[in-house]
Regions:
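Hydrophobic positions within repeat-based interaction scaffolds
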Residues: 115-118, 122-180
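Residue signature of alpha-solenoid helical repeat architecture, marking inter-repeat boundaries
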Residues: 13, 53-55, 95, 132-133
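Residue register of alpha-helical TPR repeats
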Residues: 17, 55-59, 99, 137
């Protein structure tokens, strides 16, 4: 990577932006171990620069929560959510609240707590203003839920929806932005 040797020359905010994008790149490749390393690197960078209570740190921690979920580290995922969710609620950040609920749903499904998962999803948030990348993440966890509860028709429908999105121009443009 040509950027890596020049990272130290960037401002702390730009370094965080770069490392966050790197973590997102790995996340969308389903490479959760490297995504984890990237987001932990971002967290350490922000801590070293006294940026503990910034949007960048909360963004880092919500991303860590999702990565921990995908690595099966449910306690770590929950701890990260418990730390960031009050901040996003206080800010009225509906996109981040949607993402927190998505991760909480994923944790409940992964832990086999289907009644809790159903309760979380009973809140029908309007996702028309939510970036589709986050809707797609929610759909991934909903597919798992439907598979585990035996509703294969709904799981299959969501899979087809995700495939259509992943083949779309919007998705390709999103990947190009992430790769940059």
């Amino acid at each position: 990577d040509q950027t890596e040797p020049h990272v130290k020359e960037m401002s702390p905010s730009m370094q965080a932006y770069y490392v966050n994008n790197l973590g997102n790149y790995y996340y969308y490749q389903d490479d959760y171990k490297n995504a984890l390393q990237s987001f932990l690197r971002m967290k350490k960078l922000l801590e070293q620069h006294g940026m503990m209570r910034t949007f960048d740190m909360y963004l880092c921690k919500i991303n860590l929560a999702d990565v921990y979920l995908n690595l099966g580290k449910l306690n770590d995922a929950t701890a990260m959510l418990d730390d960031v969710e009050p901040y996003f609620r206080a800010q009225g950040d509906n996109t981040s609240i949607y993402y927190c609920n998505t991760i909480r749903f994923g944790i409940a499904v992964r832990a086999g707590r289907m009644h809790e998962a159903e309760r979380i999803m009973a809140d029908k948030t309007d996702d028309s203003l939510i970036p589709y990348t986050l809707v797609n993440i929610r759909n991934k966890y909903k597919r798992r839920y439907y598979e585990l509860t035996g509703d294969y028709d709904k799981a299959y429908a969501l899979l087809n929806k995700s495939i259509a999105y992943n083949d779309s121009i919007e998705h390709n443009l999103s990947n190009m932005r992430t790769a940059e």
